[in-house]
Amino acid sequence: MCIRDRVGTDLQAILTFADKDGEPIIAKVGLSLVSVDNARKNLAEEVKDFNFDAVCAAARNDWEQALSSITVEGGGTDDLKNFYTAIYHAMVVPNVVSDVNGEYRRHNMQIGQLPKGKMQYSTFSLWDTFRAWNPLMTLIDTALVNNMVNSYLDIYDASGELPIWPLSAAETGTMIGYHSVSVIADAYLKGIRGCLLYTSPSPRDGATS
């Protein structure tokens, strides 16, 4: 089944299935900010042999590994639940907005191409995160920090400003401040420098203009 493009207001869709009572309906969904073709590629690459139970098991394993990045000792069961629930919440964002072929939508609406192994991120609530969440990431996930800083710089290159509160491929302008500057500086001072900032003074100029 393929749903063609529809343009309008107050659009609705009704889907019917020839399922039996109690029979599960499984939907495979691919997403892309670039194109429908890329959405199909993402789906084909990320979920090659679709089996719902296998996907659930793989997701559980991924979360086990992610949450194991920090080991704590002491405290009771409730303390551990609170701690690891907080770590889980800390790993929900940012979101990867690049596709499996490295293409992504830039903030000037053009299509960018990332080097192999790099990812473009969005959903940076910097007003909320610069005090604690971003410093935490410099301790537990330096690869993510490098990709995030590169994402900030790409946003600057495409739009002329470092991000404030970007979502998908656009700046929402929500909240005040220019907190991406302090996040970049924190990463640099901690020796996390696997990004493009240090060949260009432009973000510094943007912060002082």
Task: Give the positions of each predicted feature.
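Conserved small/polar residues in nucleotide/adenosyl-binding loops
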Residues: M1-D5, Y198-P203
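Alpha-helical support elements that line or immediately flank enzyme active sites
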Residues: T85-S98, S122-V145, A185-G191
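Helix-terminus loop motifs that line ligand-binding clefts
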Residues: Y104-N108, G112-L114, L144-K190
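Secondary-structure capping and boundary motifs in well-ordered enzyme cores
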Residues: D78-D79, M119-D128, G173-S180
